[in-house]
Swiss-Prot record:
Cellular component aspect of the GO annotation: plasma membrane
Similarity section: Belongs to the CitM (TC 2.A.11) transporter family.
Membrane topology category: Multi-pass membrane protein
Main subcellular localisation: membrane
Taxonomy, superkingdom: Bacteria
Parts forming coiled coils: none
UniProt protein name: Uncharacterized transporter HI_0092
Segments traversing the membrane: 1-21, 24-44, 66-86, 101-121, 174-194, 216-236, 242-262, 280-300, 311-331, 349-369, 396-416
A GO MF label: gluconate transmembrane transporter activity
Locations listed in the record: Cell membrane
Family annotation (PANTHER family): GNT FAMILY GLUCONATE TRANSPORTER, GNTP FAMILY PERMEASE
Length: 419
């Protein structure tokens, strides 16, 4: 197998980051980065292309499952189920606990299979109304939603968890369950940090408040059917050794959910909408796979391992560090998890780190910098509350603190105590 130098792998990452910052499509940015890095790293054109194709092939099963998950996502978003869940939670907790309600609503939406940026956009109209009534700053409500979304993301059947489960050959539910305790710590920190920001930054004006149509929303219980069915089907493998692949479980959950809401006749339009949400992620992951193909077959792994050995740090630290670094490079939980898992999974297993521990720590680590400005999440979330770039940038340390908290807790559980 052709090996690329560590310098070549670093060049691949730098070129990819530079192009993404220049608003080039992330998929193209990573493809070009992989090509340039491979050539500079000592491989010829044919060898570089072979490494890129090999890396992309390694991620095709995850891509198939992500496309299938579009049915569940489409049903949740288009049927009004996501709005129903949000309305119920915020109404139950009331205005006095508005920040907790927003964090919890976004966490639950993300945990049941809604993309984290879509979850924030879904909750934002309610957040703006609560902010106006309770005199909360935009920074406080946005941090509450983002922190809740990050917490939900590491225990969800979303593309990031699918990528980690596929690479480490684990049941999807195992990766989801591994994120529950770190997510709860992340939620608690989010609430306390958001409370500190109540009077900092700009406030919501009357004209920014959006009135939602709530008359035709499904009930809270029927809204939960789709994700619950999907999770129960996935849970059959660890509980009873009955394997129902996410390729089947996620769309089937969406179908049954649509039936229970009395909206089965709309399933095709829901599926098409969900597919449109998943397609950019699937395409990006193919670019991610190509980049991972170069990095995985480079000397960069050895450089990182030697650095760990010289520092005296334990070998399991490679998992969260790789997740953190790749999320910084890609500004995406999904891409960060996919690259780190594909590049470092075999090394972690050789170092004695279990599959679940490696997947859990990489997954948590990938939430630390997934909100950086060269990714779409930064701009989509800021736009959801009409926040300007300067004010949005000030939230980055708080978002990173939430991701870091979840990473530390995950590392303690799976690295230090080896549960």
């Amino acid at each position: 197998m052709t090996t690329v130098s560590a310098i070549g792998a670093l060049v691949a990452l730098i070129v990819a980051i530079f192009l993404i910052l220049k608003k080039v499509s992330p998929a193209y940015g990573m493809l070009v980065g992989a090509l340039v890095g491979g050539l500079i790293g000592g491989a010829d054109l044919s060898q570089t292309v072979s490494l890129m194709i090999g890396g992309a092939q390694g991620i095709t099963t995850a891509v198939m499952r992500i496309l299938a998950a579009g049915v569940l996502a489409g049903v949740l978003i288009e049927s009004g189920a996501a709005n129903s869940i949000t309305e119920t939670i915020t109404n139950k907790l009331g205005e006095t606990r508005a920040l907790l309600a927003l964090a919890l609503a976004t966490m639950i939406l993300t945990a049941v299979g809604v993309f984290v940026d879509v979850a924030v956009i879904t909750v934002s109209p309610i957040a703006l109304a609560l902010s106006r009534r309770s005199d909360l700053s935009k920074a406080a409500i946005l941090l509450a939603m983002i922190g809740g979304g990050k917490a939900g993301n590491i225990m969800s059947p979303n593309p990031n968890a699918i990528a980690a489960a596929d690479t480490f050959h684990l049941p999807l539910t195992s990766v989801m369950m591994a994120g529950i305790i770190p997510a709860l710590f992340g939620l608690i920190l989010t609430y306390f940090l958001a409370k500190r920001l109540i009077n900092k930054g700009s406030k919501v004006t009357d004209k920014e408040v959006i009135v939602l149509e709530t008359q035709n929303l499904p009930s809270f219980l029927t809204a939960l059917v789709a994700p619950l069915v999907a999770i129960l089907l996935l849970a059959l493998r660890p509980l009873f050794d009955i394997k129902v692949d996410p390729l089947i479980a996620l769309p089937l959950g969406g179908l049954i959910g649509a039936f229970c809401m009395g909206k089965l006749r709309n399933i095709n339009s829901y599926a098409i909408n969900g597919l449109s949400k998943m397609t950019p992620v699937a395409i990006m992951l193919l670019g991610t796979g190509a980049l991972a193909g170069i990095i995985a077959n480079s000397g960069l792994k050895e450089v990182l391992i030697q650095g760990l050995e010289h520092s005296g740090l334990p070998s399991y630290i490679l998992a969260p560090i790789s997740g953190v670094l790749m999320s910084l490079a890609t500004a995406s939980t999904t891409a960060g998890t996919a690259v780190a898992s594909n590049v470092f999974s075999s090394t972690l297993l050789e170092l004695g780190v279990s599959s679940l521990a490696g997947a859990a720590m990489i997954h948590a680590g990938a939430t630390v910098f997934d909100h950086m400005p060269h990714g779409s999440f930064f701009h989509a979330t800021g736009g959801s509350v009409n926040m300007d770039i300067k004010e949005r940038l000030k939230l980055i340390p708080y978002e990173s603190a939430v991701g870091l908290m979840m990473t530390i807790v995950s590392t303690l559980i799976f690295g230090v105590f080896k549960f």
